[in-house]
């Protein structure tokens, strides 16, 4: 039975964390103490120093030789069960997809163990539970977050290959990635492919950063983007971002802005014949509302500076081609004209600053490209949630699922038709090597990787031969790690204050996400724990830790790879607000 003293211990451990979070929220939302730029600096300090040193402190002081193998087995079994079920669902169900597999896996199995779990479980069950939480943290940092990177990069590789080599992917013998490319996700790092057929008749592909990325930097600056959304960092993968909410629960279709344009141009391949940029018209065109944005150029110009006026004669649509029977040939797309402003300045300057405006008419280039007519809108409002709220075609374009049938816009008058998806992918060895390279580049840029591995190695050595860390090093680390917990919660409060909405994905989706986080995860953990033989207090600890709020790192990955970031944002923010009463309910019920 839970006593008043037990409840007080829990409150003593948790209230200070929420005080730090509320102070940060009020500093931005109510008192306007911090600007978005300053918030970005604080978050960067937390990501680079506070959290990695906090992880190192907990891991290095935990004795790995006394780890509870059954507890670790229960946690591992829970994640494997969820992953297996989601994999079967994604392959057997028409509504399944790799994106939803990743998102649901994150929601159900990856809680905020480091920041919330250790102090909460210590307050509930004592010091030994803190050691159990450290074991979970080690597995998360070294195994499960790495697995998520594998899935994200696999998704990016499939999209890249499906878009650039829809008919010849099976003939690819090698894929070489330039050293400055750190992700295959073209929405974040604008990349292009170059293919060469060698004497063996196989295709050899080179992936490199697109030259358009430099123009994109300055187009964003000239369009007046501010620093409310901190720039993603290749260094940490642990930044806290301000999320731009989308209309659909699953953010697929987007307005055709400069970033989208350069992503399309940047990922072009010169393998097949095409236009000057090598843009291929795929079977699954993406919706665009570029013409709506272009309808009011004066308004945008008055706000962001003077732009050279487009040439109406050059922008006139071409006449439709005549078919053999004399009738106008049905076109499922139209010509899109864009005027690109480029600059030769250094691309490493501030992207989001309010610097000089670029209005040099001589630097303007006209780009003409074919854009397919948009599909009929899905009509899914924020609250209308289903796994099928995006078409099968769009799922094929995004996830590259060769087993799905893409519903494309084809035929006369834009009537929908069916186009088979690519049926071949590069050999498994080529894909495996490609993904391993990209994941390795991600890991070596993440300070949490180093802190976890160094902490684990140090603990293995010092507890084996009874070494003690030199006092000067210990105090140098502790002076920052002691602030890590409070700064992590403070950073989370800043993140919450920067969001336009606490519930960014709609009420129905938020309810579903909370059910997965606080009901499905603990239920699967309970089954896995009982299966491996956990009983008593260990079983209670396993269930309560599975009911912790959503981890922040999965949201960072979701934002970085554009895979349901609104859902993960809601899970982090709203989940943090309701986590304490929910975990207390679990604590009380399990103690009866």
Swiss-Prot record:
Extracellular side: 1-6, 60-70, 122-131, 474-476, 533-537
Membrane topology: Multi-pass membrane protein
Cytoplasmic topological domain: 28-38, 92-100, 153-452, 498-511, 559-571
Polar residues compositional bias, start-end: 224-236
Cellular compartments per GO CC: cell periphery; endoplasmic reticulum; plasma membrane
Cellular compartments annotated: Membrane
Domain of life: Eukaryota
Keyword set includes Transport: yes
UniProt xrefs under InterPro entries: Auxin_eff_plant (IPR014024), Auxin_Efflux_Carrier (IPR051107), Mem_transp_PIN-like (IPR004776)
Region (Disordered): 214-236, 282-331
Bias (Pro residues): 309-318
Tissue specificity note: Expressed at low levels in roots and leaves. Expressed in roots, stem bases, stems, leaves and young panicles.
TM region(s), chain numbering: 7-27, 39-59, 71-91, 101-121, 132-152, 453-473, 477-497, 512-532, 538-558, 572-592
Keywords for the protein's UniProt record, in alphabetical order: Auxin signaling pathway, Membrane, Transmembrane, Transmembrane helix, Transport
Binding site for (indol-3-yl)acetate: 51, 112, 114, 145, 552-553
GO biological process entries: auxin export across the plasma membrane; auxin polar transport; auxin-activated signaling pathway
Transmembrane in keyword set: yes
Annotated family: Belongs to the auxin efflux carrier (TC 2.A.69.1) family.
NCBIfam families: 2a69
Function: May act as a component of the auxin efflux carrier.
Full protein name: Probable auxin efflux carrier component 1c
UniProt gene name: PIN1C
């Amino acid at each position: 039975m839970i006593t008043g003293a037990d409840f007080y211990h829990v409150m003593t451990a948790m209230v200070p964390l929420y005080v730090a979070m509320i102070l940060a929220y009020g500093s931005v939302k109510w008192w306007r103490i911090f600007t978005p730029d300053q918030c970005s600096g604080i978050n960067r300090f937390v990501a680079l120093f506070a959290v990695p040193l906090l992880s190192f402190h907990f891991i290095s002081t935990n004795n790995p030789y006394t780890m509870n193998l059954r507890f670790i087995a229960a946690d591992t079994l829970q994640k494997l069960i969820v992953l297996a079920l989601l994999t079967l669902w994604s392959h057997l169900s028409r509504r399944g997809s790799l994106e939803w597999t990743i998102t649901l896996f994150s929601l159900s199995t990856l809680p905020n163990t480091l920041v919330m779990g250790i102090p909460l479980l210590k307050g509930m069950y004592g010091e030994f539970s803190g050691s159990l939480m450290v074991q979970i943290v080690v597995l998360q940092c070294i195994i499960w977050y790495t697995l998520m990177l594998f899935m994200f990069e696999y998704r990016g590789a499939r999209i890249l290959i499906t878009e650039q080599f829809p008919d010849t992917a099976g003939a690819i013998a090698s894929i070489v990635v330039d050293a400055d490319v750190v992700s295959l996700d073209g929405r974040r790092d604008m990349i292009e492919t170059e293919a060469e057929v060698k004497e063996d008749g196989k295709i050899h592909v080179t992936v490199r950063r697109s030259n358009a990325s430099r123009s994109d930097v300055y187009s964003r600056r000239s369009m007046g983007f501010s620093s409310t959304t901190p720039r993603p960092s290749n260094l940490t993968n642990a930044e806290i971002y301000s999320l731009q909410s989308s209309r659909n629960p699953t953010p697929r279709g987007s307005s055709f802005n400069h970033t989208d344009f350069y992503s399309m141009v940047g990922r072009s391949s010169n393998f097949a014949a095409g236009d000057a940029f090598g843009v291929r018209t795929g079977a699954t065109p993406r919706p665009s509302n570029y013409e709506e944005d272009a309808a009011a150029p004066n308004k945008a110009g008055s706000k962001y500076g003077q732009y050279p006026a487009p040439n109406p004669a050059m922008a006139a649509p071409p006449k439709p081609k005549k078919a053999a029977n004399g009738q106008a040939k049905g076109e499922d797309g139209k010509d899109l004209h864009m005027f690109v402003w480029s600059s030769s300045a250094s691309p490493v300057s501030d992207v989001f600053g309010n610097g000089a405006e670029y209005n040099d008419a001589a630097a303007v280039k006209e780009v003409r490209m074919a854009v397919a007519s948009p599909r009929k809108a899905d009509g899914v409002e924020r609250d209308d949630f289903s796994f099928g709220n995006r078409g099968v075609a769009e799922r094929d374009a995004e996830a590259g699922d060769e087993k799905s049938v893409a519903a494309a816009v084809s035929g006369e008058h834009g009537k929908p038709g069916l186009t088979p998806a690519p049926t071949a992918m590069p050999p498994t060895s080529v894909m495996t090597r490609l993904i391993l390279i990209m994941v390795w580049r991600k890991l070596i840029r993440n300070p949490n990787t180093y802190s976890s591995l160094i902490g684990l190695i140090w603990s293995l050595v010092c507890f084996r031969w009874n070494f003690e860390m030199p006092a000067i090093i210990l105090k140098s680390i502790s002076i920052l790690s002691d602030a890590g917990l409070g700064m992590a919660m403070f950073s989370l409060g800043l993140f919450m204050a920067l969001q336009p909405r606490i519930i960014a994905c709609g009420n129905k989706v938020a309810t579903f996400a909370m059910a997965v986080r606080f009901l499905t995860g603990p239920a699967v953990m309970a089954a896995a724990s009982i299966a491996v033989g956990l009983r008593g207090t260990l079983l209670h600890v396993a269930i309560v830790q599975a009911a912790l709020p959503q981890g922040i790192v999965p949201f960072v990955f979701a934002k970085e790879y554009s895979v349901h970031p609104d859902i993960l944002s809601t899970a982090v923010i709203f989940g943090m607000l309701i986590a304490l009463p929910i975990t207390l309910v679990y604590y009380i019920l399990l103690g009866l």
